[in-house]
Amino acid sequence: MEKEIYKMDFNDMTFKDIKDIVDGMKKVENIECLIYINDILMKDKRKTVQNLSQSINKFICRREEEIVRLKKMYDFDKKFANNVLIAGVDEVGRGPLAGPIVAAAVILDLNYKNHNDLFYGLKDSKKLRAKERENLSHIIKDKALYYNIFELDNHMIDTSGIAWCNNEVLKKSTLGLEVTPGIVISDGFSIKNINIKNEYIIKGDAKSASIAAASIIAKVYRDKKMEEYSKIYPHYGFEKNSGYGTDEHTKALKKYGPCPIHRMSFLSNYI
């Protein structure tokens, strides 16, 4: 398709046909082809085509800004690498009243050759819509060099405490990788009792590509698990609140009491 575009006469094409081609190029993030097409469309006198050209310009500008942002995140990680594999690790589920705490560790190929090697939209998982997270989670799992997910359930949280469990999931997700990284960077917390060099980054999921990737796959994994739990325990709205203490959730606790996946050590103010 890309080679054919350079042979097309856009002046003889209908607006619909041009738009279909442009939409296809946007979908696959083919910036080079879009720039080529737009150079032609800018000279077209049709109003609809001129409007399309303006939309292409805006798309290209947004993508160029996104490329700069992503390269900054990748380059942030490279500062720690020093020719060794770097793992980013993050947890999700520290604060909910129910369900597990989950961490993911991810090793990315930070040596991008061009913008197509970057993960468009990669950022702190909390700033993404659910569908965006799911799409990125699939891409990260497919293209990451290595990744691993580890969880501890509510019973372990009640027995050992959330602070210990938080450290344990960060540690075990890292140690469960198929290779041992030269350094692991973590979001907000240093990892105790791990025999790998560790740097913790405040707001790391906004600064580091590797930590952001870990935060996304950890959150998608946990959210999916809570959706499955909602089918077993339907009263609490787990499919919407992921176990966090929303009004709906706390009212259900008062009405129905806790279910087997609730963290009893978290419920003193609710039951």
UniProtKB/Swiss-Prot annotation:
It comes from the Bacteria. Its cofactor is Mn(2+); Mg(2+). Keywords: Cytoplasm, Endonuclease, Hydrolase, Manganese, Metal-binding, Nuclease. It is found in: Cytoplasm. GO terms for cellular component: cytoplasm; ribonuclease H2 complex. Manganese or magnesium. Binds 1 divalent metal ion per monomer in the absence of substrate. May bind a second metal ion after substrate binding. InterPro entries: RNase_HII, RNase_HII/HIII, RNase_HII/HIII_dom, RNaseH-like_sf, RNaseH_sf. Residues 84-271 form the RNase H type-2 domain. A divalent metal cation binds at D90, E91, D187. It holds the Pfam family RNase_HII. GO terms for molecular function: manganese ion binding; RNA binding; RNA-DNA hybrid ribonuclease activity. One of its GO terms (biological process) is DNA replication, removal of RNA primer. The keyword Hydrolase applies. It catalyses: Endonucleolytic cleavage to 5'-phosphomonoester. Its main location: cytoplasm. Its EC number is 3.1.26.4. It is an enzyme of class 3 (hydrolase). Endonuclease that specifically degrades the RNA of RNA-DNA hybrids. Belongs to the RNase HII family. This is Ribonuclease HII. The lineage of its organism: Bacteria, Bacillati, Bacillota, Clostridia, Eubacteriales. The gene is rnhB.
